[in-house]
């Protein structure tokens, strides 16, 4: 589970600009389905090789007309779940009643808060910050997000220490969790009302009743261990598990943050799509996030029952067009969670994806496959020289990481990298899991000796003169 930074504040103070600086913007996940604000953004960021999540909560106000209940709930969740809060204010406008309202909400929380005074370019920083100390938060810092002024200092000063402390504790906790982990850890992800709760109950068994709502918690993800045909599993539920008869046709409780964290904590992710609504940009955002995090993936297209043959053909065509990037390596199952149709096949794909993601490959096998790939299709020329791949080894599992050493590997085109991925995938029969390739420049073990010899020869020539 990643460290979470929440960016909060009233509208138009520069929250999105700061979000873009922290996440490099292209990593943003924007969700606009019902129950989640259209401008809500979630992104991944990195500091010294440590990953963390960033959420831009959108403008918070007590006066917005039609301020949606779910919009407020998502902002509340973001603040409640955050390890660190960046409370952004406008240094040019000065302190406003809107800022006071946000500050009053944050004072009710036991959170680490940094008041980030934005838009201070062309102004006296100390003067701009002065009035914001009245909020009662002891950490106040001035930046210009648009010009990236002091943004790195902001991260160095306020994020570095808590982030490192979090991952020290998290690593120890995670090691304990791994020891206690019950079989294959998988999660069901998807938009609200696609049938995640119905599918969860179907997987757990008809008479299984799980209490979801925990005292004092807005939305909790619950890990539920169970066993099927001798195989142990743990399902991570983020929507709430209810007895079948008590599932109402209302909008599910939904937390994007919980969903992203569930993806990171899973071995396998089952993306649930509503066949009657089709696959949306939000579905694609969640799938891309899962792949980027190296999770094994299975796709379950729910509510397949009762559809006409014509509609089914249309759905399959849309899936093929929108999921082209999965390169046919992810199993797609057309199911009815309500009636249990094909749910057993989903379990089979979970087992297969998990096995492939954790498959043991020796250095000899990895190198042999690399050599076969090169023999079938050599790397391209770089100037007068051909890129040379020397040997390969496994660098990790879940996802499988193949490390290839060679010369000029930094110039290897993406097309050849895709070729290698497809070659390895076919040769190893990898289903359901992404494969990560890392390319490392081989070091010349005689380089230092050669340089030393050159220096010695140079000094000798000077003496001769």
Curated annotation (Swiss-Prot):
One of its GO terms (molecular function) is ribosome binding. GTPase that plays an essential role in the late steps of ribosome biogenesis. InterPro entries: G_ENGA (IPR031166), GTP-bd (IPR006073), GTPase_Der (IPR016484), KH_dom-like (IPR032859), KH_dom-like_a/b (IPR015946), P-loop_NTPase (IPR027417), Small_GTP-bd (IPR005225). Residues 359-443 form the KH-like domain. It comes from the Bacteria. HAMAP family: GTPase_Der. Residues 3-166, 184-358 form the EngA-type G domain. It comes from Francisella tularensis subsp. holarctica (strain LVS). Residues 446-465 are annotated as: Disordered. The gene is der. Keywords: GTP-binding, Nucleotide-binding, Repeat, Ribosome biogenesis. The keyword GTP-binding applies. Associates with the 50S ribosomal subunit. GTP 1 binds at residues 9-16, 56-60, 118-121. CDD domains: EngA1, EngA2. PROSITE patterns: G_ENGA. This is GTPase Der.
């Amino acid at each position: 589970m990643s460290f979470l930074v929440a960016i909060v504040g009233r509208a138009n103070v520069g929250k999105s600009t700061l979000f873009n600086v922290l996440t490099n913007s292209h990593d943003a996940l924007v969700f606009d389905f019902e129950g989640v604000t259209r401008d809500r953004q979630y992104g991944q960021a990195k500091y010294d090789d440590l990953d963390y999540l960033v959420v831009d909560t959108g403008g918070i106000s007590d006066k917005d007309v039609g301020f949606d209940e779910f919009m407020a709930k998502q902002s509340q969740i973001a603040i409640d779940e955050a390890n660190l809060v960046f409370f952004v204010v406008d240094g040019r406008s000065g302190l406003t009643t809107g800022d006071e309202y946000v500050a009053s909400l944050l004072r009710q929380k036991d959170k680490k808060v940094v008041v980030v005074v934005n838009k201070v370019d062309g102004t006296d920083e100390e003067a701009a910050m002065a009035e914001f100390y009245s909020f009662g938060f002891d950490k106040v810092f001035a930046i210009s997000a648009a010009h990236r002024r002091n943004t790195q200092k902001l991260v160095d000063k306020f994020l570095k220490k808590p982030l490192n402390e979090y991952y020290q504790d998290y690593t120890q906790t995670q090691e304990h969790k791994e020891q206690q982990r019950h079989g294959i850890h998988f999660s069901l992800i998807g938009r609200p009302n696609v049938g995640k709760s119905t599918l969860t109950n179907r997987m757990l068994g008809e008479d299984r009743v799980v209490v979801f709502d925990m005292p004092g918690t807005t939305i909790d993800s619950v890990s539920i261990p169970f066993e099927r045909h001798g195989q142990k599993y743990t399902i991570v539920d983020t929507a709430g598990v209810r007895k079948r008869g008590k599932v109402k046709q209302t909008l599910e409780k939904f937390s994007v943050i919980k969903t992203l964290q569930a993806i990171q904590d899973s071995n396998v992710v089952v993306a649930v799509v509503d066949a009657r609504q089709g696959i949306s940009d939000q579905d694609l955002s969640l799938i891309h996030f899962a792949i980027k995090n190296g999770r094994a993936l299975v796709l379950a297209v729910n509510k397949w029952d009762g559809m006409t043959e014509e509609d089914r053909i249309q759905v399959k065509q849309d899936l093929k067009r929108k999921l082209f990037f999965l390169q046919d390596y992810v199993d797609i199952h057309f199911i009815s969670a309500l009636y249990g149709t094909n749910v057993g096949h989903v379990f089979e794909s979970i087992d297969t994806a998990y096995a492939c993601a954790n498959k043991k490959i020796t250095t000899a096998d990895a190198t042999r496959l690399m050599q076969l790939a090169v023999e079938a299709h050599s790397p391209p020329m770089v100037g007068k020289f051909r890129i040379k791949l020397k040997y390969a080894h496994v660098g990790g599992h879940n996802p499988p990481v193949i490390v290839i050493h060679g010369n000029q590997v930094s110039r290897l085109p993406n097309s050849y990298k895709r070729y290698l991925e497809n070659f390895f995938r076919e040769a190893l029969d990898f289903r359901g899991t992404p494969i990560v390739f890392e390319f490392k420049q081989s070091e010349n073990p005689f380089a230092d000796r050669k340089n030393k010899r050159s220096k010695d020869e140079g000094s000798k020539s000077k003496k001769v003169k």
